[in-house]
């Protein structure tokens, strides 16, 4: 049972007499106020006042009834504990400097004499004068040892001060928690002493502000942080929403349109250039014109056409020609065919010179008639026309009548 209950019970006046009656005749424990009052009035003998000035006892208060009930319970517990323990423990030898509370003599409380309110101690029987005595628990210093130590419980050094049950160890600072650990000598408060109580918030360090709701700026959180827009970005956004006035600067010129015009047979310079470029593109494979290098040109196809097929290649610009050279390893584009061949191509494709078809009067001149039609159309290239004429001559030679052989006599004479 809690030691505070025992202290408050033994320290009250007028309770020791009830303890004596409880030792002589135990009664069942009951917390009913009416029953306790009836039993006290019926069983308590009438005592004559010891002094003329002693007043008659008043009615029993509620606190006294609770105290009497607690004393009765203590008496029952004491009897059961004594029967269970070994009686020889009372005669055991205690360590040096130790005291046993059971062998202490009762001493009256200072300033209080024997009177009507005084009662006898727990052991029964008073002093020589018969005055009751009460044990003052506060005067029993050094009788309770520190729990959890290696010493025997209840034994301390003589004259040592009473230490509370959950007192801090030596060297602990004042104001420590109830269950705080001992601090090293000369050291300040430890982490346990600085820990806030249970349920309380820890104090923020100086200068630390809340992230939300405070006056300080919010801290950036990695990828979620967006930098404020610059002046250029703001101007761009305003232009998208509200529009802006810009000056029109034309970028198209006649030179930039060169190569995209129609090949019209006119006396204008632009028409002649477009016609010449169209003819050259057809001779180079018929690729469309493009002034951007690498858009319509395939370096592999150009190399195969130029090296293996021995055909001309047309480049839309000088930059495209250089790009093809850099794209193909160990491939060098020559300056072109011989000067005679270049002049022939220039006269035929650019200047528009061609061989005039000849008029054939007789339909029997088949070869000349075919050459006439080949010169008036672009369906046959010069190489294709040569192949066609060669085959035609073979067929015509096979259809000619053979010459008659010479007579045998003439051969003999010869």
From Swiss-Prot:
Residues 20-35 have a biased composition (Polar residues). The keyword rRNA-binding does not apply. It comes from the Eukaryota. GO terms for cellular component: mitochondrion. Signal peptide: none annotated. Coiled coil: none annotated. The keyword Manganese does not apply. Residues 20-71, 168-229 are annotated as: Disordered. Keywords: Mitochondrion. Its main location: mitochondrion. Residues 45-59, 168-200 have a biased composition (Low complexity). It is found in: Mitochondrion. Residues 205-224 have a biased composition (Basic and acidic residues). Component of the mitochondrial ribosome (mitoribosome), a dedicated translation machinery responsible for the synthesis of mitochondrial genome-encoded proteins, including at least some of the essential transmembrane subunits of the mitochondrial respiratory chain. The mitoribosomes are attached to the mitochondrial inner membrane and translation products are cotranslationally integrated into the membrane. Component of the mitochondrial small ribosomal subunit (mt-SSU). Mature N.crassa 74S mitochondrial ribosomes consist of a small (37S) and a large (54S) subunit. The 37S small subunit contains a 16S ribosomal RNA (16S mt-rRNA) and 32 different proteins. The 54S large subunit contains a 23S rRNA (23S mt-rRNA) and 42 different proteins. Belongs to the mitochondrion-specific ribosomal protein mS46 family. This is Small ribosomal subunit protein mS46. It comes from Neurospora crassa (strain ATCC 24698 / 74-OR23-1A / CBS 708.71 / DSM 1257 / FGSC 987).
